[in-house]
């Protein structure tokens, strides 16, 4: 039986996992629920791949490859390399241990919904926090580019985010069981520094989520430092949706429900403009280069409820 959450975190597969490493060192991991983006989920070489969910699980289990922020540390790639030799192209480079985990998830999905499969795998990995996929339903994401429509990983991996982005579209799905309750029962909800459009956006656009967020104390960490995203094409995606590619644009996306935005010292010049949208702006170092940075940011976020 999961303990009632003190903190609920909305997460994608980049940025936020680093913050989670700090949070679990500041509060009891059992008091943390992580709601994870699933819009990138799909099948690859016959196995079900849930990139962001697995990254969060591996991070909380202490086995994440911190050089890439996906997959298992020290993994081998014999299966991936053999498949390529056999003429079976794989867009994603999946390690052998990582693949075994995905095979198990695929088998479990033949018997149960995704949130139950994730719960079983979470316990098997010894993860103390509760990890919830945002939805049990499949969601399609399309990156509309100046070269035509592309699947997310086609754009991100095969094309290395190079084409110009005109729009980002994803289907709206229903929250998985427990998602809305995890938000409404939390002392604080944190939107981690993941991509606001393709990672956090699909979560907050699900039915009922924004209404739930309006009822609670919500803080967010901007994924921008000095006008540049921590990683990935967040800037391109935000501009394609009509937002400024900056911490100010993040504030615009979250303005309907956000109580506080934490921004980096390099973005301090935006504080005045952001305060027109968000009632509280905190300026600190948000670039998490080591465990000390991660703990410090976690303490700043949780200061008022610790």
Curated annotation (Swiss-Prot):
Annotated keywords: Magnesium, Transferase
Enzyme type, top EC level: transferase
GO molecular function, one term: magnesium ion binding
Cofactors: Mg(2+)
InterPro entries per the UniProt record, alphabetical: CofD, CofD-like_dom_sf, FbiA/CofD
CDD domains for the chain: CofD_like
Catalytic reactions of this protein: (2S)-lactyl-2-diphospho-5'-guanosine + 7,8-didemethyl-8-hydroxy-5-deazariboflavin = oxidized coenzyme F420-0 + GMP + H(+)
Residues the entry annotates as binding 7,8-didemethyl-8-hydroxy-5-deazariboflavin: 54, 93
Superkingdom of the source species: Archaea
Annotated GO biological process: F420-0 metabolic process
Keyword Cytoplasm appears in the UniProt entry: no
Pathways involved: Cofactor biosynthesis; coenzyme F420 biosynthesis
Enzyme Commission (EC) number: 2.7.8.28
Subunit structure: Homodimer.
Family designation: Belongs to the CofD family.
Function: Catalyzes the transfer of the 2-phospholactate moiety from (2S)-lactyl-2-diphospho-5'-guanosine to 7,8-didemethyl-8-hydroxy-5-deazariboflavin (FO) with the formation of oxidized coenzyme F420-0 and GMP.
Alphabetical list of PANTHER family matching this protein: 2-PHOSPHO-L-LACTATE TRANSFERASE (PTHR43007:SF1)
Protein name, per record: 2-phospho-L-lactate transferase
Gene that encodes it: cofD
């Amino acid at each position: 039986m999961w303990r009632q959450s003190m903190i609920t975190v909305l997460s994608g597969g980049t940025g936020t996992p680093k913050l989670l490493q700090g949070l679990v060192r500041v509060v009891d991991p059992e008091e943390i629920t992580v709601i994870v983006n699933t819009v990138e989920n799909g099948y690859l070489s016959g196995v079900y791949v849930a990139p962001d969910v697995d990254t969060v699980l591996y991070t909380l289990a202490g086995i994440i490859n911190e050089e890439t922020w996906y997959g298992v540390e020290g993994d081998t790639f014999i299966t991936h390399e053999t498949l390529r030799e056999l003429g079976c192209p794989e867009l994603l480079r999946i390690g052998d241990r990582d693949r075994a985990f995905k095979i198990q998830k695929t088998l479990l999905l033949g018997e149960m919904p995704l949130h139950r499969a994730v719960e079983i795998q979470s316990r098997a990995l010894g993860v103390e926090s509760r990890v919830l996929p945002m939805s049990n339903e499949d969601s399609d994401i399309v990156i509309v580019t100046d070269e035509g429509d592309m699947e997310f990983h086609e754009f991100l991996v095969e094309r290395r985010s190079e084409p110009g982005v005109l729009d980002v579209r994803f289907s709206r799905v229903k929250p998985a069981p427990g998602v809305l309750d995890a938000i409404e029962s939390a002392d604080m909800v944190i939107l981690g520094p993941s991509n606001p459009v393709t990672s956090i956006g699909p979560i907050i656009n699900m039915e009922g989520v924004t209404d739930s967020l309006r009822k609670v104390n919500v803080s967010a960490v901007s994924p921008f430092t000095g006008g540049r995203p921590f990683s990935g094409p967040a800037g391109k995606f935000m501009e394609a949706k009509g937002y400024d590619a900056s911490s100010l644009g993040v504030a615009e996306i979250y303005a309907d429900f956000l109580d506080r935005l934490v921004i980096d010292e390099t973005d301090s010049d935006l504080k005045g403009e952001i305060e027109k949208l968000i009632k509280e702006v905190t300026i600190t170092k948000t670039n998490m280069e080591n465990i000390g940075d991660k703990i410090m940011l976690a303490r700043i976020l949780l200061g008022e409820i610790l």
